C-alpha cells in the first residue's frame, strides 16, 4: 500500500511539473529559424537554425528593488502573435530603405510585465516591457547566451581597467582589436563589449548585440563558465557620485554607484537583446 501511495505521489508530482512548464514556438518568415520559449520555474529561450541548435535554453530575467524577479516562476496571462512586413527609410545607411519582416510572440505575464520575441530570417530578438504605472528600480538583469558546445568566439575585450575589477573596466573607450578563442578560454576577468561573434560551425555565425538602448546601461558580456558554454550579461550600476576628469577634463567620472542599474518612472519597453544568425558575408 505504501509503495502504491509513493508511486502515485511521484506520478502526480511529475505530471504537475510537466503541466507547470509551458512552451511556445516562434518561427522566422522563411521557417529556417525557430525559437522555443519556455515558462516554467524560469523563463528561457532556445534557437535552432535548419533544425540545428544555435542557442541552448538561455535564461532571461529582471530583478526589481521590491524583490520581485520578472522571469522567476513566470505566470503567463495572455499570448499574442503578430507579423509585420514593412519598409523603414534609412537615408544614412548603405541602402535607402530596410525591409522589416518578422513574426512576433508576446507573452503577457501576471505582474505588470510582458516579454516580446521577434523572429527574422536573419536572427531573433527579445525585450522586456513594463506596464507598471508606479516608479521602481531595476537591481539586475540576467541576459545569458548559452551555446550547445564549446564554440569559437571572436570578441573585443575592454582594453583598460584592472583585471577582475568590472567597476574599473566600465570606464573605457570601446576600442580594441578582436580576440578569437573557445568560449571556455575567454578571460573571465575582463568584460567584452558588443558586437561579438560566435562560430556555430558549417559556415553559420551568431552575432550578439543590442538595440533601442535608452535610459539603460549598455550590455557587456563575460565568460559564463565552461560548464555552461556561454556568455552572461554584466551591467554598470547607476551613478551615485560623479566628478569632472579624464583627458583634458572632458569626461564625467563615476566615483560611487547606486545599488540598481536603472530607474523606471513610467510604462516602457527595455532594450532588445539580439542574436543575428548568418554567414560572414551576411554579417558584413
Regions found by a protein language model. Give the residues of each.
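Bacterial Sec-dependent N-terminal signal peptides
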Residues: 1-22
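N-terminal accessory beta-strand-rich subdomains and adjacent acidic, glycine-rich linkers
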Residues: 23-284
